[in-house]
Amino acid sequence: MVNTTISLGEVRQDLVRAHNQAIAALSKPGTWWTGAQRRELALTAQLAISELEPVAPWVGISTVANKLPASLTAPKIAHDAIYRISRHAATLTREWYEKVTAEINPLAFVELCGIACTIAPVMAFRRSLGLPALEVGSAESGQPSNNEPDNIVAAQLNWVPVVGPADKDAAVVQAFTAVPETNRVIWAMADAQYIPDKEMVDPNWTRGTLSRVQMELIATRVSQQRECFY
């Protein structure tokens, strides 16, 4: 545990807002999952990240007694997938992805990845500063929108489908495009946590705190430590 005297008031407020809004969205109906399912999957992602002795990547969390609620609203394979993504991302393979998406819609899988990618940075940020965790609120009623863009295509750079034309942007840029609302939330967080997309091409851009070089050094180090190999 990090000992620190930092308060939430000392954190940039645009970053606080981005995190609050992203976590709040987890309990609302999404594109392919209900609010109850999204909240449930978010809690499984939190479990995966926080466990001192995590379940092995080849073991489905849904098969382990007393790990998940007895009554689940999301399919067990979705819980197994988000647990593994959240804790054992370096072990994922295309064969595993194809097995999962044989049982759940590939676009629902994209949204599931977005839930994991919302939980992980917020938890890590707050834990590193000794701040209390943000709680996922009660689930809101309503049905998923099932909003599917017209021009969804297969990609070479990603396992998941993307909005075409494919592979004109980096894999990380096009990864969530097939689920626009998830894409919007993830990039709103990225703008606050890292660099606004429109500023990415400027090597001298800064908020007046860290320089671009310093930011890239930290980002590279975090990526290496987290085994982010994209």
What do the predicted segments below correspond to?
Residues M1-Y230:
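Hydrophobic alpha-helical segments
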